[in-house]
Amino acid sequence: MNTVLKKETLSRAERLGEVRPAYLEALTLVERLHRRLLDVIKDEFDRRGRSDINAVQALLLYNIGDKELTAGELRTRGYYLGSNVSYNVKKLVEMQYLHHARSRVDRRAVRISLTQRGREVHDVVTSLYEKHVLTVEQIGGISGDDFSRLNVALARLERFWTDQIRFRL
């Protein structure tokens, strides 16, 4: 019985030894990829001579798209990746990239949607992503199957983290 317990402990320690470096590398890559995506978006706007908007704001406008949302919905739906939703929404309204109006249902809530100017930014990001879709397999060496497997793993990781918060695991 003692031998079985030692094998069980050893195998758990071995699994931990295998998972730890892979998990920590994945965390580093996710964080680095997010920063790199913002760099790619910034570079696209720089190439077009646009310095009126930053990459976080452009990504926010892209994620809003044709929807009409509240700032709270931006956070809860995961569309917003930064820490200060209110600040960027306020700036985008001031710069006329976003419409804002009181909700007809809940007068406390402000609904936001893209202006024509915001749609133009959305279209720049859409065009960038379309260019990537056409070249990522040939130049980046990443196939549709690779993305499918990656998306399954990332969705599982997101669910794991969500459960950590929700159920205080």
Regions found by a protein language model. Give the residues of each.
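C-terminal regulatory/oligomerization modules of transcriptional regulators
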Residues: 1-19, 142-169
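Generic structural concept
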Residues: 31-34, 61, 65, 115, ...
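N-terminal helix-turn-helix DNA-binding core of bacterial DNA-binding proteins
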Residues: 39-83
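N-terminal leader segment of winged-helix/HTH proteins
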Residues: 1-51
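Charged, amphipathic alpha-helical coiled-coil/dimerization segments
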Residues: 6-12, 90-149
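N-terminal positioning helix adjacent to the helix-turn-helix/winged-helix DNA-binding module
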Residues: 22, 33, 56-57, 117, ...
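Alpha-helical linker/hinge and terminal dimerization helices associated
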Residues: 33, 37-40, 44, 78, ...
